[in-house]
Each structure stands twice: as C-alpha cells, then as structure tokens.
Amino acid sequence: MAQGFKPAKAKKAATSPKSGSKAKSGPKRGPRVIAPKKKAAVQAAKTKQKQTASITARIEQEMVSRASKGGPLTIMKKAADGDADDKKKNQNKK
C-alpha cells in the first residue's frame, strides 16, 4: 500500500451510561491516617481525637443523668431555662 495509509480503527461497542462502572459516592471508609514522618501533625491529631472523645462522653453522660431526672434534655442552659419557663406559664394558664 501507499505510504501513510492507516487502516480504520475498530469502533468500541456503544455502552449505555448505566452499564459502566459506577463511581462510589461519599467518603472513603476507614480512619484517615497522617504520614508518620509528620510528628507534630500526628500528635495534634491524637490530642484532638482524645478531646473530642472526652467531650462526647461527658455530654452523653450529662444527657443520661438529665433523662433519668425527668428534666429538659437540652444542652444549652438558656434554652432549657426558656423551655421550663414556657411549661410553667402553660400550667398556670390551665
């Protein structure tokens, strides 16, 4: 054949968008790991994780104690006081 002749390329079979592989949505599973060569970042992440865990545990225990007492289950004091005042006003009206 002549120079520069290029045979026709084989066409790919037409695929519908549904048959293609689906990209996973959402974050990846598992904990995020910081490279061990960054000691300061690793240490900061550890302390942040400990603080978060302790704060969460304290809030959960506080909510359990409030639930057992039968009081309002709000974390913010002003909102709890406002709810208690509203309940007292409603009881006085009846």
Curated annotation (Swiss-Prot):
Q: Where is the composition biased (Basic residues)?
A: 25-40
Report the SS bond pairs: none
Disordered: annotated segments: 1-94
List the biased-composition ranges (Low complexity).
Answer: 1-24, 41-57
Q: Record's InterPro entries?
A: UPF0390 (IPR019034)
List all Basic and acidic residues biased stretches: 78-94
Q: Family per UniProt?
A: Belongs to the UPF0390 family.
Protein's name in the database: UPF0390 protein UM03986
Origin organism is Mycosarcoma maydis
